[in-house]
């Protein structure tokens, strides 16, 4: 999914890749992994987002895919979960040994000021070129797609591991009423669960 943010003369185009799949080797997961690998090579800057103080086997696998020469920022998200800031220093040293990160950005993605600071850090890495999208565009996806992803995300959030990762939300009918969207009714529940 492409996210677009235009601030002044700068346009940020974020490529949100699916998570790298290490547990299952299904055709879907292989396809998702191929998408991740393709996206990593076609960007001007990589934002490697991990939970502050944590590093998983899946994180290590993704990190091993990064091509040299692409600036990479280590984004330590959920900094509020680290009780003492001094606890982060050994983790940060370990991360620097794993990869030559260009910069370290501690933050909380829930804080608007942290997001603005991150955009300010990213801006100098972007090439000077014409914009790819209009100033008011937020994504390259349709509203129908965004609605289906919102429903899917809510299903995962409220059902946890009960819902298989391969689940898909299909919207049969999508009505736009003014500035309000009417989300579809959930039907054929038996088709949702295997």
Per-range role (PLM):
Residues 1-2:
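Conserved substrate/cofactor phosphate-moiety recognition/catalytic segment
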Residues 5-12, 30-104, 175-179:
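Conserved C-terminal guanine-recognition region of P-loop GTPase G domains, centered on the G4
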Residues 6, 41, 45, 67-71, ...:
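Non-catalytic alpha-helical coupling and interface elements of nucleotide-dependent molecular machines
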Residues 16:
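Conserved active-site aspartate in kinases
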Residues 20-29, 80:
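Flexible beta-alpha connector loops of hexameric P-loop NTPases
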Residues 70-73, 80-145:
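Canonical P-loop GTPase G-domain recognition
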Residues 143-194:
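P-loop NTP-binding site
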